[in-house]
Amino acid sequence: LIMEAKEYNTLIIDDHPLIIEAFRNALLHIAKTTEELEFSITEATSCDTAQHIMERYNPHKTLDLVFLDIKLPPSPTLGMLSGEDLGLEIREKHPQAKIVVATTFNDNYRIQNIFRNINPEGFVIKSDIDTETLVAALMEVLLDPPYYSKTVLQAIRKYISHDYLLDKWDRHLLYELSQGTKMKELPDL
């Protein structure tokens, strides 16, 4: 039983040639070491170029995998401020595409925003990854998503542990409200 290789139409969007090369090399390594994965790779260094390339894809020729740098220069003509705007458009027009966000932003607020808006199948902070990690990350995104790099996971953990932290008093207030206690009666408790 010979399995036919699955070819992924892949778009790498980053304004740094070295990063594009790293992604390309990781994909070529995967294609060489697995028999069932192949990649047709296109590159874009700006929102405008990416937008132009994305127009080539349709239901018969799908865009399957996208590497998206968030810190892309703005595109006034498209009304895009960063790669995040481009990510929203990819989600809308190519819902089947697996998006791997790669960024240097590592603050919790930006990471949460990207999750909320794009919800990528892969999310890596560039300083977290080397060639080996990148290959492993891509395999996971393709075969068993999601993949999040260490800093992203730490931000998620921090968000979860901070967002729902209720002390005894908070729980008591919620209980009283659920029992029909009026807001104006709360100070008397």
Predicted regions and their residues:
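Conserved acidic segment of CheY-like receiver
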Residues: E7-L28
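Acidic, metal-coordinating helix/loop segments flanking the phosphotransfer/catalytic sites
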Residues: T42-L65
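Acidic catalytic/metal-coordinating carboxylates
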Residues: S46, P76-D85
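Conserved phosphotransfer cores of two-component systems
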Residues: R56-H60, E89-Q96, N117-I118
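Active-site residues of response regulator receiver
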Residues: D64, L68-K71, S75-P76
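A short, hydrophobic beta-strand element within the central beta-sheet of small alpha/beta folds
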Residues: V66, L86-Q112, I125
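Short, flexible helix-to-coil linker/hinge segments that flank and couple to helix-turn-helix
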Residues: Q112-R116, P120-G122, D128-Y164
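Helix-turn-helix DNA-binding segment
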Residues: A155-L189
